[in-house]
Amino acid sequence: MSSFHATTIFAVQHNGKSAMAGDGQVTFGQAVVMKHTARKVRKLFNGKVIAGFAGSVADAFTLFEMFEAKLEEYNGNLQRAAVELAKEWRSDKVLRKLEAMLIVMNADSMLLVSGTGEVIEPDDGILAIGSGGNYALAAGRALKRHAGSQLDAKAIARASLETAGEICVYTNDQIIVEELE
């Protein structure tokens, strides 16, 4: 799968709270910023689940809708909804061409969902995707490791995205953070 430009999504669970942050930049091709304030992180299922996407915007909206339908079908069971979405995404000839990745989380767990059928739960309660994902991941791991009670999940998520935005040209400082307690 090619690298996705135009976004960074970061999710963290820390001290009993969960937060996900995403920047607002949408890049057309490799040279033009089309939008600065896109909302790529959203609460779903009556505010009990947060989902964030990296990749093609139209593809991601399709996946958001499909994932939300799976959440409803499986009564909010995050793992089951994610696995069923990944199975359908991977096996359907049309859906297989969608170019996006999702991070989904509730108060208890978080998962990376991809079109190649992967559903991955991290060992350390941190996930990041998109063009600035590795920068945000490194910053987030350092912050979480040394934060103790001085930083909450929301602060770690915001600071990780800010760091990625300072390094990655496809990530801006128009950050949206959603939090679960």
Swiss-Prot record:
UniProt keyword annotations, A-Z: Cytoplasm, Hydrolase, Metal-binding, Protease, Serine protease, Sodium
Subcellular localization(s) per the UniProt record: Cytoplasm
EC number: 3.4.21.-
Annotated binding of Na(+), by residue: G165, C168, T171
Superkingdom, natural source: Bacteria
GO MF annotations, alphabetized: metal ion binding; serine-type peptidase activity; threonine-type endopeptidase activity
Family statement: Belongs to the peptidase T1B family. HslV subfamily.
Chain's role: Protease subunit of a proteasome-like degradation complex.
The name this protein goes by in its record: ATP-dependent protease subunit ClpQ
Source organism: Bacillus licheniformis (strain ATCC 14580 / DSM 13 / JCM 2505 / CCUG 7422 / NBRC 12200 / NCIMB 9375 / NCTC 10341 / NRRL NRS-1264 / Gibson 46)
Gene: clpQ
